[in-house]
Amino acid sequence: MNRKKIIVAAVIVALLATLAYGWHYYRQQNDASLTLYGNVDIRTVNLGFRVAGRLASLAVDEGDDIHPGQTLGKLDDGPYLNALKQAQANVQSAQAQLALLKAGYREEEIAQVRSEVAQRQAAFDYADNFLKRQQGLWASKAVSANELENARTARNQAQANLQAAKDKLAQFLSGNRPQEIAQAEANLAQTEAELAQAQLNLQDTILLAPSAGTVLTRAVEPGTILSASNTVFTVSLTDPVWVRAYVSERHLGQAIPGSEVEVFTDGRPDKPYHGKIGFVSPTAEFTPKTVETPDLRTDLVYRLRIIITDADESLRQGMPVTVRFPQR
């Protein structure tokens, strides 16, 4: 009986020991800080002018640091200044034309047209009376058929001129048609749009830095004739600084957006940078060869983007880093 109790006790002790070891191992695996490997993300942008022209000057060179809004270069703006002046003149002309149509006709202009109607009425009366005389003479064979036809043609032309003058007077008395005013308004809107485009083109003769960075390459020199979008500078963006790292599926649950991490470099192994996870890729991929990791290259991993919150000039793009998550 005692022997049986001893065996049962031994089994219980062994079972408890196994459970204790398993729990200890589980806690070790979950409490240990997660270590990942990656690189400072390389982000570059090609800068160029949106408009074509002759390069007048460049303000920075390779290796220079730049800040947002800094002037990097200028094109010869002469052609664009001329285009702007022409666009401004077109707008002024369209504004004057619209104002003239809206104001209608002046009394002096109406009086002038009335006088024109009276003159053409007199001319028609004379031509009509002359035709009647010629018709009487034709009946008595005193004029030729050609003379009669010339008189009829002159009377018809005088009648057409009189009708044109009367139509013009009617238009002057009723004012401009709404369609004419609408057309003038549309013409003004078009010239204003052309003016806005001319102003934008002139602004684009100055190349401004879009964000902070470092000039990597200077592709052209002053005097070069550039087409729109030709690369002038290649710039490495330095703000914000991102780290690209990779996490296995087994540890994916620890890589939560917003989680704080520490980032170590070989240059300062005892003084980490601090960052937060900003993005976790929804799709898996094989570990890139550029990442220094002890994991198998055939393992599927998920890409992380870590935003460094206290970056300095020592953190260079492409630099290998070690990312550590704090113990839970």
UniProtKB/Swiss-Prot annotation:
Query: Carries keyword Phosphoprotein?
Result: no
Q: What is this protein called?
A: UPF0194 membrane protein YpsIP31758_2812
The coiled-coil segments of this chain are: 80-109, 141-209
The entry's cellular-component GO terms read: periplasmic space
Keywords from UniProt, A to Z, are: Coiled coil, Periplasm, Signal
Q: Where is the signal peptide?
A: 1-22
Q: Where in the cell is it found?
A: Periplasm
- Family classification: Belongs to the UPF0194 family.
Record HAMAP family: UPF0194
What InterPro entries is this protein classified in? CusB_D23 (IPR032317), UPF0194_membrane_YbhG (IPR022936), UPF0194_transport (IPR050465)
Q: Which domain of life is it from?
A: Bacteria
Keyword match Aminoacyl-tRNA synthetase: no
Cite the PANTHER family for this sequence: EFFLUX SYSTEM COMPONENT YKNX-RELATED, UPF0194 MEMBRANE PROTEIN YBHG
